[in-house]
């Protein structure tokens, strides 16, 4: 039995779609589970839309979520000659033919199909056309000659056996009239040359699979195993598209979703193992199988993603969380100065308790990350004469404290509450605004302890405040 080999084959025409990430993950996990190999093929034959920057971003995105590939990337555009050679061989052996139908004729056929509310299938007009009767002024396309008798059976490892009438499969184009190969030819030749044993992809590819199976048979190549996974839908039950919000991997990393959390979510999106919800990477590899993939579409639930992300934020240690925060800020916010580590890292113990994303942590930690406090007019309006007196007196009392903790700070706050006949908010709010620039955020004592005596005194002496 051949060693398992799977692949992920994105087109570098834009950011990596979340559905593609799940497909890559399932292929990667299956190959790892079987001690096989996982390959990345860049399908860049659309020269107008394919960009190097998209290819680079796809590779970075896969790496971000923990998916690595074996060997170098397989670049489809470098194999076009091989694709063309196979097309010519199919033509020579009678498994393909030249089609001279004009674009106007094809459009008319499509129009009639739409009027009858039927799927378009080429009418095979040129299938048996003799070369001597072919028009000389039209450059032909080459179509594959489908074996139209009988049925084709796809032995799908997820969907089970799927059977269709061969007459419903059109004689599809394999070479355009400019000599360039089409998707179904290129993908089939590549999969054969790469020795792929398992093709795991979305179930919107099923009709392509029936076409590609006929190429395999015509070329006397061994068929790989096929597994078609259900598509991802929106929470409303519609097919997820690139136009939907949060449809690309970048959309999730940008708001501070952690790689492990998103990988865990995508693993469970359409796959299950007993009633287990949280999987380590090691468990994912050991337990993943194709039998656990369901047949129905799965709904993308942002609230569930946030809940999982919150779980990961709260359960990983502060050293790991700090590393994630540093990387996140470097890409999407502002680079954290190395000297801030000693203040931020201990503060993560309380900062992560109110956070669902890395962005939440960043927003709550701004007062530590940045030395200069930025105030909004609406918050400064809350600093009246009474608030200024509270800030000034707290600063004076703080000088006598050597160790900052709740036990040393609470008596000072309670004295001020009593003296100014107010409540905790009456004391805490002006202090919080003076120290962080906001009336919201972490607990007052946590803020003071994390900043330290010297920095607290400096900020409470800010002329903008007092």
Swiss-Prot record:
Its cofactor is Zn(2+). Keywords: Aminoacyl-tRNA synthetase, ATP-binding, Cytoplasm, Ligase, Metal-binding, Nucleotide-binding, Protein biosynthesis, Zinc. Its EC number is 6.1.1.17. The keyword tRNA processing does not apply. Zn(2+) binds at residues 99, 101, 126, 128. One of its GO terms (cellular component) is cytosol. One of its GO terms (molecular function) is tRNA binding. Binds 1 zinc ion per subunit. Gene3D superfamilies: 1.10.10.350, HUPs. InterPro entries: aa-tRNA-synth_I_cd-bd, aa-tRNA-synth_I_codon-bd_sub2, aa-tRNA-synth_I_CS, aa_tRNA-synth_I_cd-bd_sf, Glu-tRNA-ligase_bac/mito, Glu/Gln-tRNA-synth, Glu/Gln-tRNA-synth_Ib_cat-dom, GluQ/Sye. Pfam families: Anticodon_2, tRNA-synt_1c. It is found in: Cytoplasm. This is Glutamate--tRNA ligase. It comes from Pelagibacter ubique (strain HTCC1062). The lineage of its organism: Bacteria, Pseudomonadati, Pseudomonadota, Alphaproteobacteria, Candidatus Pelagibacterales.
């Amino acid at each position: 039995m051949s060693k398992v080999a799977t692949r992920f084959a994105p087109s570098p025409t834009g950011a990596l779609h979340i559905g593609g990430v799940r497909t890559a993950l399932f292929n990667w996990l299956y190959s790892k589970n079987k001690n096989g190999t996982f390959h990345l093929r860049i399908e860049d034959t659309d020269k107008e839309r394919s960009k190097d920057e998209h290819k680079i971003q796809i590779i970075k995105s896969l790496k971000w979520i923990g998916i690595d590939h074996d060997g170098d990337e397989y670049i489809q555009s470098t194999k076009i000659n091989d694709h063309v050679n196979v097309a010519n061989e199919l033509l020579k052996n009678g498994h393909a033919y030249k089609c001279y139908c004009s674009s106007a004729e094809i459009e008319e056929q499509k129009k009639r199909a739409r009027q009858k509310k039927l799927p378009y299938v080429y009418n095979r007009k040129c299938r048996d056309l003799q070369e001597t009767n072919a028009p000389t002024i039209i450059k032909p396309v080459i179509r594959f000659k489908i074996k139209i008798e009988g049925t084709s059976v796809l032995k799908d490892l997820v969907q089970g056996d799927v059977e269709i009438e061969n007459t419903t499969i059109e004689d599809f184009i394999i070479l355009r009239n400019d000599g360039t190969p089409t998707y179904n030819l290129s993908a089939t030749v590549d999969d054969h040359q790469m020795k792929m044993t398992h093709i795991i992809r979305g179930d919107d590819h099923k009709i392509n699979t029936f076409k590609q199976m006929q190429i395999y048979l015509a070329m006397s190549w061994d068929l790989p195993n096929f597994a078609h996974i259900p598509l991802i839908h929106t929470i409303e039950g519609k097919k997820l598209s690139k136009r939907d919000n949060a449809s690309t991997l970048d959309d999730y990393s940008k708001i501070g979703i952690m790689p492990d959390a998103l990988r865990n979510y995508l693993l469970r999106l359409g796959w299950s193992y007993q009633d287990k919800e949280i999987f380590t990477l090691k468990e994912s590899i050991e337990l993943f199988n194709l039998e656990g993939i369901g047949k129905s579409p799965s709904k993308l639930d942002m609230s569930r993603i946030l809940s999982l992300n919150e779980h990961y934020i709260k359960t990983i240690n502060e050293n790991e969380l700090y590393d994630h925060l540093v990387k996140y800020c470097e890409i999407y916010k502002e680079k954290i100065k190395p000297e801030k580590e000693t203040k931020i890292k201990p503060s993560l113990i309380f900062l992560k308790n109110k956070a669902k994303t890395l962005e939440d942590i960043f927003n709550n930690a701004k007062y530590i990350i940045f030395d200069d406090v930025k105030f909004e007019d609406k918050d400064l309006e809350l600093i009246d004469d009474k608030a200024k007196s509270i800030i000034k007196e707290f600063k004076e009392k703080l000088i006598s404290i050597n160790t900052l903790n709740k036990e040393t700070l609470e008596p000072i706050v309670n004295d001020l509450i009593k003296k100014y006949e107010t409540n905790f908010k009456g004391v805490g709010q002006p202090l919080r605004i003076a120290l962080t620039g906001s009336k919201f955020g972490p607990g007052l004592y946590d803020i003071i302890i994390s900043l330290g005596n010297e920095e607290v005194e400096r900020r409470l002496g800010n002329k903008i405040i007092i």
